[in-house]
């Protein structure tokens, strides 16, 4: 049963109804409709914290989805779930894959920077300043890319870049 049919939230039900109407009236292929249905169900499961179900839906959505832009958001959301699960290597992989298809995802650059910064902090706690510096430098590069795409955002990252003298 489609997740939209079992969700009891009024707003989710309304959104599902609107999405289903749009799917019927907008000319799309059956593959696009299938991908959207899986994507929508994945987002619903993700918003409820049902990450395993969300991942299953997102993976299913990648099969029929051929549009690089739409596919980038599916891959980005897979990265989000892996980040939430503490699977940072997998998360980075999916953020990279999303950016290959859509290089204008500042949130992917930001999330990659956050992971790199976190790894840098871990290296500091372990007493490995050389590794910490490498991770911090990588975080800086990703934050610079995110900021370049959306200059008014990521103020904390901008401050960190200035404090650590990595902002040019």
Curated annotation (Swiss-Prot):
GO annotation, cellular component aspect: chloroplast thylakoid membrane
GO terms (BP aspect): photosynthesis
UniProt topology in membrane: Peripheral membrane protein
Highest taxon above the source species: Eukaryota
Chief location bin: plastid
InterPro entries: PSI_Ycf3_assembly, TPR-like_helical_dom_sf, TPR_rpt, Ycf3/AcsC/BcsC/TPR_MFPF
Pfam family, one: TPR_1
PROSITE patterns tied to this protein: TPR, TPR_REGION
Gene3D superfamilies listed in its UniProt record: Tetratricopeptide repeat domain (1.25.40.10)
TPR repeat extents: 35-68, 72-105, 120-153
Keyword Coiled coil on entry: no
Signal peptide: none
Subcellular location(s) of the protein: Plastid, Chloroplast thylakoid membrane
Homology family: Belongs to the Ycf3 family.
Function noted in UniProt: Essential for the assembly of the photosystem I (PSI) complex. May act as a chaperone-like factor to guide the assembly of the PSI subunits.
NCBIfam families in UniProt: PRK02603.1
Protein name in UniProt: Photosystem I assembly protein Ycf3
């Amino acid at each position: 049963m489609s997740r939209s049919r079992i969700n009891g939230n009024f707003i989710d039900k309304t959104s599902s109804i609107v999405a289903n109407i749009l799917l019927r009236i907008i000319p799309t292929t059956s593959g696009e409709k299938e991908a959207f249905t899986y994507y929508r169900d994945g987002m619903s499961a993700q918003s409820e914290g049902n990450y395993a179900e969300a991942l299953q839906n997102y993976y299913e959505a990648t099969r029929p989805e051929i549009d690089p832009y739409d596919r980038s958001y599916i891959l980005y959301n897979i990265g989000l779930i892996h980040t939430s699960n503490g699977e940072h290597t997998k998360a980075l992989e999916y953020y990279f894959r999303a950016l290959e298809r859509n290089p204008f995802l500042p949130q992917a650059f930001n999330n990659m920077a956050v992971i790199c910064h976190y790894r840098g902090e871990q290296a500091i706690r372990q007493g490995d300043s050389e590794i910490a510096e490498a991770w911090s430098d990588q975080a800086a590069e990703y934050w610079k890319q995110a900021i370049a795409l959306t200059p008014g955002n990521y103020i904390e990252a901008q401050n960190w870049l200035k404090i650590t003298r990595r902002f040019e």
